[in-house]
Amino acid sequence: MERAAKKEAVESLNGLFQTTSVAVVAHYSGLTVAQMQKLRSQMKQAGASVKVSKNRLAKIALEGTDVVAIGSLLKGPTVIATSSDPVAAPKVAVEFAKANEKFVILGGSMGKTVLNVDGVKALASLPSLDELRGKLVGLLVAPATKIAQLTTAPAAKVARVVQAYASKSEAA
């Protein structure tokens, strides 16, 4: 790799690390091309990305970013999964690691917090941002529907009483 290409790669990686909120580092030695493509497509569907780069260049690119702590994990054939959603990359990485034993999660970083393997798995078990938003909307809408039911219930009861009284007087 030429010096200019290395500089461009470092700048590209640094831009990626500046905008990410979570990074997961894993070994990928022994995975086939098809498995790597599957990992990339799963990450893309989840809104995350996967990068394979020289560890030395990645360490340089990490300087000055929030996820600088993952530099110590960059040894051997590593892949870095990043996402702006704190749950997307860890969730896909953990699911992929369960299906492919050659994909070994080393750890990661969420902001300036370093995560070990258990931390990445714990982060992956959390609901996604969209799921949390859905639950929040459900909680906000539930009281409104209850109020609507309570306000219409007395009117419905009065209508049934009047209907029963009317049918009783017709029968008499």
UniProtKB/Swiss-Prot annotation:
SUBUNIT field: Part of the ribosomal stalk of the 50S ribosomal subunit. The N-terminus interacts with L11 and the large rRNA to form the base of the stalk. The C-terminus forms an elongated spine to which L12 dimers bind in a sequential fashion forming a multimeric L10(L12)X complex.
PANTHER family: 39S RIBOSOMAL PROTEIN L10, MITOCHONDRIAL (PTHR11560)
A GO BP entry: translation
Function: Forms part of the ribosomal stalk, playing a central role in the interaction of the ribosome with GTP-bound translation factors.
Protein name: Large ribosomal subunit protein uL10
NCBIfam families: PRK00099.1-1
Organism this protein belongs to: Rhodopseudomonas palustris (strain BisB5)
Keyword RNA-binding applies: yes
Domain of life: Bacteria
Species classification: Bacteria, Pseudomonadati, Pseudomonadota, Alphaproteobacteria, Hyphomicrobiales
Entry annotated with the keyword Iron: no
Cross-referenced CDD domains: Ribosomal_L10
One GO term describing the cellular component: large ribosomal subunit
GO molecular function terms listed in the Swiss-Prot or TrEMBL record: large ribosomal subunit rRNA binding; structural constituent of ribosome
